[in-house]
Swiss-Prot record:
A GO CC term assigned to this protein in UniProt: chloroplast
Protein name as it appears in the record: (+)-3-carene synthase 1, chloroplastic
Residues reported to bind Mg(2+) 3: 529
Range annotated as the organelle transit peptide: 1-45
GO biological process terms on file: diterpenoid biosynthetic process; green leaf volatile biosynthetic process; terpenoid biosynthetic process
Keyword Magnesium: yes
Pathway(s) it belongs to: Terpene metabolism; oleoresin biosynthesis; Secondary metabolite biosynthesis; terpenoid biosynthesis
Location(s) in or outside the cell: Plastid, Chloroplast
Family: Belongs to the terpene synthase family. Tpsd subfamily.
GO MF annotations, alphabetized: magnesium ion binding; terpene synthase activity
Catalysed reaction, written as an equation: (2E)-geranyl diphosphate = (+)-car-3-ene + diphosphate; (2E)-geranyl diphosphate = terpinolene + diphosphate
Source lineage: Eukaryota, Viridiplantae, Streptophyta, Embryophyta, Tracheophyta
Length: 626
């Protein structure tokens, strides 16, 4: 019996009533602070035991070991997690608040075809849209958002937009805020609009008198610049100007809501931002009541709903995390001592990009897929011998449990958890897509493992490929395609072939997302990889192709490639002429954001840094104070 039958993949395992006991907020913080960072006990898979004894550690074979730290999250602690917010009364309260926030949207009501207030009606509508999105509650207000944006878009011009429909002049704050929101929602807007906010010398400039409004205007300009498309020079100029201005402003601004907003966007740019982390940060900012110029009553109502929604989903997260723990333990994953045990960190990222309670199947599929990728990565990169890896690659192509007969003992367990989990996810995908997708996923898996085998052969022979050879193979071995494909197929969103072609390999969307992940990952991991005997990386291959170049030269070149590809990925995601709507691409794009988040400053995955642990605590383990 596998975990698949013991703990269903679908959301049924998280729909049971929550444990009745309530952990108070302060008690939870104490528990987190004293959390033992060690693994306890051993686990036996119901079908095949994967133990350190059978993992080849004492089989006389010379093996490379990644030397990764153990799982940071104590089993007993994970199983003790509980929350009161799964009770139906909280859901009913949230429904009432949702109705009240809809009334706020409607309070900008239309009379005789026009909004009642002509002074700042446009900015008010944009403020509401921006706030519900940053607070992570926008899914409840899609109709209201569409009505608001359609109205504001009527007043959009080549020179931008003002605060209200009767404004005599356009202003940078409203224009930048509108530009960003319009682009993210698929409206056609040109970045040339920002040319009208340059001085006579053709440069962005700020007035001598710094004000909070001016700083916020530049802040929104910076946010708009982060969703630039290729060749949008004016947004490149805007980003440089805004970044310099805001960095200087942080030196003089008091600690306030605005300064914290600025720091957050500097820390987590759009392509690596997690919506749930942003929601937690913005909830904290609004709770401190430090943002001036916002409608106080409306802010309080939004904040009350955002806190409640955050905590309701927090209860969902705890049950899903416990489901994943059982899967991880049942298959004996803790006994694979050569791999990175990061199911908690992976779940944190996945639940950070999708906060819809009904999407449990998607989240669990995504985490399981990422954990399988990690097992394969560590097996091919370090632990497995080249002969063993060839056998495993051939067994995956056969896709039959009998293929384990020719495998070493430690590989048998790896093969079976891969086989059973992928097949079970394919069954879930068939329910959603109403067609068999297993063959499609198997081909992606074979391509992925084939790229791993090629890299293992390079390691075994000491071969350092050309940059282009390494890069093309690295896009496959990054794991982006397989981490994205299987989970999105479990969503209730239909993915017919013509839409899947725009997202999956060999689409430009997939190519750019995988490229960024490979390049960014290498810039963060190349030193540790080299220490383990993995000489091929984008840095070493670039230096081989360019004799006399330094590591700094290679990093500068690669970082430039990443910046260019981020703009290209923005275009593929948001382009208005694409066959696949933004809604269909959103989950694939957000998986990309989540994976990139791991490499924001360092390899926060192989070595779970303080930032990674803080992320887990803030977005999964700790509720917000109501």
């Amino acid at each position: 019996m596998s975990l698949i039958s013991a703990v269903p993949l679908a959301s049924s395992c998280v729909s049971k009533s929550l444990i009745s006991s309530v952990r108070e907020h302060t008690a939870l913080r104490r528990a987190i602070a004293t959390l033992q960072m060690s693994r306890r006990g051993k686990s036996v898979a119901a079908s095949i035991r994967m133990s350190s004894a059978t993992a080849g550690s004492d089989d006389g074979v010379k093996r490379r070991i990644g030397d990764y730290h153990s799982n940071l999250w104590d089993d007993n602690f994970i199983q003790s997690l509980s929350s009161p917010y799964g009770a139906s009364s909280y859901g009913e309260h949230a429904d009432r608040l949702i109705g009240e926030v809809k009334e706020i949207f409607n309070s900008f009501s239309i009379a005789d075809g026009e909004l009642i207030s002509p002074v700042n009606d446009l900015l008010q509508q944009l403020w509401m849209v921006d706030n519900v999105e940053r607070l992570g509650i926008d899914r409840h207000f899609q109709t209201e958002i569409k009505v608001a944006l359609d109205y504001v878009y009527r007043y959009w011009s080549e020179e931008g937009i003002g605060c209200g429909r009767d404004s005599a002049f356009t202003d940078l704050n409203t224009t930048a805020l509108a530009f960003r929101i319009f682009r993210l929602h698929g409206y056609t807007v040109s970045s040339d609009v920002f040319e009208h906010f340059k001085d006579q010398k053709g440069q962005f400039a700020a007035s001598a008198n710094d004000t909070e409004l001016q700083t916020r205007s530049v802040f929104n300009l910076f946010r708009a610049s982060l969703i630039a498309f290729p060749e949008e020079k004016v947004l490149e100029e805007a980003e440089k100007f805004a970044a310099a201005y805001l960095k200087a402003a942080l030196q003089t601004l008091p600690v306030s809501g605005l300064s914290r907003e600025i720091q957050y966007v500097f820390d987590y740019r759009w392509h690596s931002n997690l919506p749930r982390l942003e929601a937690r940060s913005y909830i904290d900012i609004l709770a401190d009541n430090t943002i001036s110029g916002t409608p106080d009553a409306n802010t309080k109502k939004l904040l009350e709903l955002a806190k409640l929604e955050f905590n309701i989903f927090h209860s969902v997260q705890q049950k899903e995390l416990q489901c994943l723990w059982r899967w991880w333990k049942e298959w004996g994953c803790p006994e694979l001592t050569f791999i990175r045990h990061r199911y908690v960190e992976f779940y944190t990222l996945v639940s950070g990009i999708d906060m819809v309670p009904e999407h449990a199947t998607f989240r669990l599929s995504c985490v399981k897929t990422c954990h399988l990728i990690t097992i394969l990565d560590d097996m091919y990169d370090t632990f497995g011998t080249i002969d063993e890896l060839r056998l495993f690659t051939a067994a995956v192509k056969r896709w039959d449990p009998s293929a384990t007969e020719c495998l070493p003992e430690y590989m048998k367990g790896v093969y079976m958890v891969l086989y059973e989990t992928v097949n079970e996810m394919a069954k879930e995908a068939q329910k959603s897509q109403r067609r068999d997708t297993l063959g499609y996923v198997r081909q992606a898996l074979e391509d992925y493992i084939g790229s791993y085998l090629k890299e293992a052969q390079w390691i075994a022979t000491g071969y350092v490929p050309t940059f282009q050879e390494y890069f093309e193979n690295g896009k496959l071995s990054s794991g982006h395609r397989i981490a994205t494909l299987q989970p999105i197929l479990t969503l209730s969103i239909p993915f017919p072939h013509h839409i899947l072609q725009e997202i999956d390999f060999p689409s430009k969307f997939n190519d750019y997302a995988a490229s960024i992940l490979r390049l960014r990952g290498d810039t963060r991991c190349y030193k540790a990889d080299s220490a383990r005997g993995e000489e091929a990386s984008c840095i070493s291959c670039y230096m081989k192709d360019n004799p006399g170049s330094t590591q700094e030269d290679a990093l500068n070149h690669i970082n430039g490639m990443i910046e260019d590809m981020i703009k290209k990925l923005n275009w593929e995601f948001l382009r208005p002429d694409n066959n696949a709507p933004i809604s269909s691409k959103k989950h694939a794009f957000n998986i990309s954001r989540g994976l990139h988040h791991f490499y924001n400053y360092r390899d926060g995955y192989s070595v779970a840094s303080k930032e990674t642990k803080d992320l887990v605590i803030k977005t999964v383990l700790e509720p917000v104070l109501m």
